[in-house]
Each structure stands twice: as structure tokens, then as C-alpha cells.
Amino acid sequence: MQYQLGTGEFKNWIVAEDSFQPDRLGKCESIMCLGNGYMGIRSATEENYLGNTRNTFVAGTFNKFGDEVTELPNVADVIAMPSRLNGELLDLSKGKVEDYLRTLNLKTGLLERSFVWVSEAGARLKFAFKRIVSMKDLHLIAQE
């Protein structure tokens, strides 16, 4: 994790991950989580990996069964975007990853992730994702 990428008005406001490390997905999902006081979402990647945790929580909702402890229920995953390109599933643990960068701007709440993926078949593709949880509309998660 890097904490020194911001400049100008964003100096000391950017948290960054500059390489894809499947064994550290959970750490980044937690550190870069997004929320607005009503809704919170772990910053899982758009594609699924073994061991990643996809959670979205809504304040004021509770789940209990029998004698179990009451806990926040995990609502539907609206972030997953599994992608197939020429029949190949986007999977950064296969092929080659270049120019990987995931950042969270703590001042604006914008999560961004970009990378170049060279698939096992040799296709070279550039990806860029953006995500935000709205402060103005507490029920809105936006992803591009």
C-alpha cells in the first residue's frame, strides 16, 4: 500500500495499491471500503477471486436465526462484473498484468482501478473502473 501519491489539494488524501497481489485482496478490500453512513461496501475487485469477500451492508438491517448472534446481513452484490473477452474470462491471476493501480481518494470518496491485462491467448486489453457511494443519495452506488 502507498500513501504518498496525492498532489496539490489531494496531497496525503490518496491510498494506493500499485500491484495486483491476490493474497492481499482482503486487506485492500477493507482499507479501501466505501460508505456514506447508511450503506457500506467492501472494495472487492469487479472480477471474482478465490478468497475475496464481497460485502455490502445497510444500516438498520439485522439478521438473526434461532439462538445465533444478531448481525448485519450482507445484501446483494452489485459490484461483480465478470467479463469474457473472446471467450476468455478476465482473471488477473492468469496471463500478465501491467500498469496496475488501484486508488482511493479519501477526500472525494472515489475508488479507481486501472491496468493492462495480457491474456493467456495474447490479447492485450486496457481496463479502467471507477466506483463511488453517494453522500447525496444514501441509496446510490455508482460504478463505471
Task: Describe each region flagged by the PLM.
Residues 2-144:
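Beta-sandwich/jelly-roll carbohydrate-recognition scaffolds of carbohydrate-active enzymes
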